[in-house]
A protein has these predicted regions:
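Intrinsic disorder/low-complexity segments
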Residues: 407-451
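Conserved helicase motor
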Residues: 87-98, 109-120, 141, 502-507, ...
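Conserved helicase motor "Helicase C" RecA-like lobe of SF1/SF2 P-loop NTPases
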Residues: 150, 154, 504-526
């Protein structure tokens, strides 16, 4: 069925022209196009309309699981009658296999799988094989090895009433599909047998199970029923059962793989012995032969993914099968927050290779294990077709490639994909940077999608709310602390919130102590703050439990704080990662959801990044003001309910998935996952006190503890002397 967009809203502001232009560009066959959408302009709604217009299977990529969950929730609301799937890493905890030569330490693979995420992943692959109205929201997990779609499709079981098949034949087929027989614990991925009745709980379905009734060697009846109550919901004429795992291999390929694994093992042992590395040879022989025995007897082994090249019959060095292979060739790829996602795609391969090369060199794995890897960036680009990049700050890679006639892709000139370099679009009166293309400001009727070399970067800078980009003001460094204090007091009187960004953790902590001694309700936020505290601090800021948040890197994409009206950027002229063009634009965007939004840059000189921020802001404000005047629009602040304090709702002994509770601030499952990883790492490092503290915080999270119940990690320093006249900068100097 076609995509059916369900929404009470109509495109407003720049959305209509962006939808029309990008739909036209994709329909014309252009491979690369970019949506340059400012914060709060409704980029997700625009993407949903484009998907509806194009009507093709779509992959939406995000650079982290939290934003992926937010997108999943939004697209589920936009397309309730279509298949919207969620594909991210299903590990609650994952310790990869590794070896540290200098200490002769081998770290065995350890992991904990989230069953709900596993079900959603299986649902993704089954939807892609059976229908076209599919939208998959995925993290970078989609470029990791997943197995062959041909093998997966070959292993599924098609059943229908009247089919000639014995009960034993069906049971054998289910076992080959990695289902487990369990007549008592009937859960996902299990089947049970009662006389001539076989009941199967598919791995990709949560609420339904299926009953197959036999009459001799013929299927007499198929019905869908509730696995909890046993109530039959409906009778079926046919049924498709998908494999219980995504890594499934037909029997003939499994036998062939055992032969080729043995051949590679013999070659590698001979090489080690020729080099005098007898320990490595013996280690590899013992480990691999044990795995071969497990594969022969059980059909799988621990770490079977390391033999994926043999199981799929790929030649050495060939790319692995991934989720991308489950899509038809004409699918659309949407890369959200492309300035962060594109570099992430390019960086996954190198990190994986460096770890596995050590395992191969020291005899823990065969060289073929190197081919169980994420895609290289060129392989990703080869497998994808048409791409829509979405970002408020698209990088040089996206801008350069988004031109008519570019059927391949232009790598970054320094072979570093996605590095921020230049003005993202042409500005009237500003010098043009040669490496960029101008964004489209023409009407959809005159938008050229056919002439080679024409830019395909579409602006979306008019917000549906009529809000303007925040004003940019520059103040001197000398009085930045006193000025910030006074500005905070003014905003606090109006019951508005303030973000202050510094360059170091120490400065953030000291500044918050100084403000606290002067009566300001303030907290700091940086990477040393535990996961629960970070989430609770953001929630408490929105709820008004404090007024000022001091941090290092507050530009996190997707950080939605409508109550923030002022962003103070200290030491703005210190050019670098934290004060780059992308960072400054993203940080300034945190004040773009408030009608009184303002950004203060404290600097003695105007850097190139600052100048570009000012030019971009002036250009956008001019267009926004003109649009509001022409259409008689009065700007209004964004309104959104503050989420409750972190908690987990337990129903019938089952942890409720956080995907349904995602509202944009945080993902409960993500928080727990990060905490559990920290706890496991602390325990493995024998830091048992730290592990116990993390365990207690997890318990507080489950009990619904608020921000005030979390113990501080640092004793605040008193700056009462400063309140009596001592300058903040001098006080810092005395502390060394």
């Amino acid at each position: 069925m076609p995509f059916q967009l369900a929404s009470d809203y109509q495109p407003q502001g720049d959305q209509a022209q962006a939808i029309a232009k990008l739909t036209q560009s994709i329909a014309s066959g252009n491979r690369h196009q970019t949506l340059l959408g400012v914060t709060g302009s409704g980029k997700t709604f625009t993407a949903a309309n484009i998907i509806r217009n194009i009507d093709r299977p779509t992959l939406v990529m995000s650079h982290n699981k939290t934003l992926a969950a937010q997108l999943y929730s939004e697209f589920k609301q936009f397309f309730p009658d279509n298949a919207v799937e969620y594909f991210v890493s299903y590990f609650d905890y994952y310790q990869p296999e590794a070896y540290i030569p200098r200490s002769d330490t081998y770290i065995e693979k350890d992991s904990s799988i989230n069953e709900e995420i596993e079900r959603l992943r299986l649902s993704t692959t089954s939807s892609l094989l059976t229908r076209r109205d599919v939208i998959v929201i995925a993290s970078v997990s989609c470029i990791y090895g997943l197995g062959s779609p041909e093998d997966y499709a070959q292993m599924l079981s098609q059943l229908y009433v009247g089919q000639q098949i014995s009960r034993e034949g069906l049971l054998a087929k289910l076992v080959d599909m990695l289902y487990e027989r369990n007549d008592i614990g009937f859960t996902r991925g299990k089947f049970r047998v009662r006389g001539d009745v076989v009941e199967v709980h598919p791995a990709n379905v949560d609420e339904d199970a299926f009953r197959i009734e036999f009459f001799g060697d013929e299927i007499d009846r198929i019905s869908r029923f509730d696995p909890l109550t046993g109530t039959v919901a409906e009778s079926l004429k046919k049924l498709t059962i998908f494999p219980a795992k995504q890594f499934v291999t037909p029997t003939d390929k499994l036998r062939r793989a055992q032969v080729t694994i043995r051949e590679e093992l013999d070659e590698r042992i001979a090489w080690f012995e020729s080099q005098g590395k007898l320990l490595e040879a013996q280690r590899l022989k013992m480990r691999t032969e044990y795995d071969l025995e497990m594969i022969q007897e059980m059909g799988f082994c621990s770490g079977i993914e390391n033999y994926s090249r043999h199981l799929s019959g790929r030649p050495p060095g060939a790319r692995p099968g991934t989720l991308l292979d489950f899509f038809p060739r004409d699918f659309l790829c949407v890369i959200d927050e492309s300035h962060a996602s594109v570099p992430q795609i390019g960086g996954m391969y190198e990190g994986d290779r460096s770890r596995k090369s050590v395992l191969v060199d020291y005899g823990f794995r065969l060289p073929s294990a190197m081919d169980n890897r994420p895609l290289r960036f060129p392989e990703f680009m080869e497998r994808t077709g048409q791409i829509l990049y979405i970002s408020a700050t698209p990088a040089e890679f996206e801008i350069t490639n988004s031109v008519v006639g570019n059927k391949d892709y232009v790598p970054h000139k320094r072979d570093r994909i996605g590095v921020d370099e230049s003005v993202p679009f042409a500005i009237a009166g500003a010098p043009r940077v040669e490496s960029t293309q101008g964004a489209s400001t023409v009407s959809p009727d005159t938008f050229d999608t056919n002439s080679p070399g024409m830019p395909l970067v579409v602006e979306q800078i008019i917000r549906p709310t009529g809000l303007l980009d925040p004003q940019i003001t520059i103040r001197p460094l000398k009085t930045q602390i006193d000025d910030t204090l006074e500005l905070c007091r003014v905003r606090i009187e109006k019951q508005e919130r303030v973000l202050v960004t510094t360059l170091t953790k120490r400065t953030a902590e000291d500044l918050s102590d100084y403000f606290r001694d002067l009566g300001i309700k303030v907290r700091y936020l940086h990477s040393d703050i535990d996961t629960i505290e970070r989430v609770e601090i953001l929630r408490a800021l929105r709820a008004g439990e404090f007024d000022v948040l001091v941090g290092i890197n507050l530009l996190r994409e997707g950080l939605d704080l409508p109550e923030v009206s002022l962003v103070c950027i200290l030491d703005a002229d210190k050019e670098g990662y934290l004060r780059s063009q992308t960072s400054l634009i993203q940080t300034a965007g945190r004040a773009a959801r408030h009608i009184n939004g303002e950004v203060i840059l404290f600097a003695d000189t105007i850097t190139g990044s600052m100048q570009r921020l000012i030019e971009v802001t002036e250009y956008r404000r001019a267009r926004q003001i003109a649009y509001n005047t022409e259409h008689n629009i009065t700007p209004r602040s964004v309104r959104r309910a503050v989420q409750e304090s972190l908690h987990l709702i337990l129903k019938s002994g089952k942890k409720e998935t956080s995907l349904r509770e995602m509202t944009g601030d945080f993902d409960l499952s993500e928080v727990l996952t990060e905490l559990e990883v920290e706890m496991q790492e602390a325990s493995a490092s024998m830091e048992y006190e730290k592990a116990a503290l993390l365990r207690d915080q997890i318990m507080e999270l489950k009990a619904g503890a608020g921000i005030d119940k979390i113990e501080p990690k640092r004793q605040p320093v008193s700056y009462k002397a400063a309140a009596k006249g001592m300058k903040f900068g001098k006080k810092l100097g005395k502390r060394g």
